[in-house]
């Protein structure tokens, strides 16, 4: 995990990884647990710095069992969490959250929305009005 975080923070755009966790907020503790078990024995503080420097967003998928309704297993995005920095722990905000119906809805402003817009993100499609960070 330490090697992955180092590779992700080398300045090249675009990284993707998967990890099993029970929520988007639990991902940071899961990474820290793996890092302390690694060969490097990275302490929590150093791991948090690496996480904040390497990860921009955590996208959490969940499953909904619809077998009882004659359906199938449905996977959907339940949470999108933006990493905002570090202060003894990884600071993050849940920018999209499950609305209880299996749809992720806006939950907090995205601090890097201008960067996302430069890459093609359209906040009007999400929010109905253009929202730019100040």
Name each model feature, range by range.
Residues 1-60, 65-85:
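Conserved P-loop NTPase nucleotide-binding/switch module
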Residues 68-134:
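NTP-binding/hydrolysis catalytic cores, primarily Walker-type P-loop NTPases
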């Amino acid at each position: 995990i330490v090697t992955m975080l180092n590779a992700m923070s080398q300045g090249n755009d675009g990284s993707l990884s998967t990890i099993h966790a029970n929520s988007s907020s639990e991902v940071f503790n899961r990474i820290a647990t793996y890092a302390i078990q690694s060969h490097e024995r990275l302490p929590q503080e150093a791991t948090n710095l690496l996480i904040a420097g390497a990860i921009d967003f955590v996208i959490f998928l969940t499953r909904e069992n619809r077998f009882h309704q004659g359906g199938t297993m449905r996977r959907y995005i339940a949470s999108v969490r933006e990493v905002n920095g570090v202060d003894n722990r990884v600071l993050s905000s849940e920018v999209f959250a499950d609305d209880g119906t299996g749809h992720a809805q806006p939950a907090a402003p995205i601090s890097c929305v201008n960067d996302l817009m430069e890459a093609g993100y359209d906040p009007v499609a999400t929010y109905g009005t253009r929202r730019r960070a100040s």
